[in-house]
Amino acid sequence: MATQQTARETHGNYHRSVVVPNQMTRVRRASARAARAISTQLAPELRRHRSLPSDVAVAWAGSRLCGALLGLHGIAGESRAELIDDCIDILEPELCAAFEATGSSKRRALASARRCVRSLMAALPRVQRTLMLDVDAAYERDPAATSRTEIALAYPGIRALCIYRIAHHFHQQRVPLVPRMLTESAHASTGIDIHPGATIGAGCFIDHGTSVVIGETTVIGCDCTLYQGVTLGARRFDRTKGGAIRRGLKRHPTLRDGVTVYANATILGGKTIIGSHSTIAASVLVQESVPSHSTVRPGKNEIVVARSDSSRRSERKSGNSARKSLRRTAR
C-alpha cells in the first residue's frame, strides 16, 4: 500500500484524494505544458496583459453604488458616505488596471483613474435624479407595485438601469473595459442587456425585463416603456472593402419620447425612428420608421400602422395655425 500513487482519506462522509510526491511532479509538468500551449494560442493583445480589472470587484462596486443611489445603504448598517468611500476604494484600482491594460503607464493610469472617480462623484447627484424618475415611472405604470421601496429593492429593470447609468457615465469619459463589465454584471443578474453606449432618457420603465436587449447606438427618449423580450438591435453591419466591420456607426433604432414597446417586439436599424407616443404591439418586427402617435400591430402577412384620431386632429389644428401665420406674414 505504501507504493500506491494515491490514497483515500476519510473524514466522516467526505473523501479527499492525497497525491504523493512522484505523481505531484507529473501533474506539475502536465500543468506547465498546458500553460505553454494555452499562452501560444492567445491573441497578441491578450498575451501582453499583466493587469486586468477584476469582474468580481467591479460588480461589487456597482452593486454598492446602486445601494447608495437608491437609498438602500441601511441594509448593511452603513451611512451613505461610508458606502461611497468604500466604492471609491474598490473602483480606483480597477480603473487603474483597466487603463494599464489598454497601454497607459502606471503613473498615467493612476492619474486617469482618480480623474474618473472624481468625475463620477460629481455626477452622482444628477444620476440619482434621473434614477428617481425611473423609480417614479415604474410606480406609476405598474399596478402591481406596492411602494417605491419595493421597486428599488426588487425590480430588475431598476437595477439594470442604475448600473447602466453609472456605466454610461464612465463610457462618456472613455474609460476602457469597466463600463461593459458593469453592464454585463447587471445582465447576469437581471437578464437585461444594455450596452453602456446607449442613450436612455429619464423616466424609463423596463417591466419584467428578461431578455431585453438595447444595443450600443440605441437612443431612447424620456418616459418610454419596454416589456420583456424587446430587442433594439442592428439590421446589418457595414463593412470595409477588406471585409472588416465598420465601428462607431449608428446601427440601432431611435425611440422618441413616450414610446411603449410590448413583449418580444424587435426594432432594427440605425435609420429606424419610432415617433413620439407610439405603441409597438407584441411580437412585431419593425425595420422602418413609424410616425408619431401610431400603433404598430401585426396583420395578415403585413404590419399595420394605425394613427390615432387625436393625433390627426392635433396635426390639422397645427397645420391650420401654420397656414394662418403664413397668411399674416404674406400680408
Question: Model-predicted segments: where are they?
Answer:
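Structural signal for interior beta-strand "rungs" in well-ordered beta-sheet cores
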Residues: 187-309
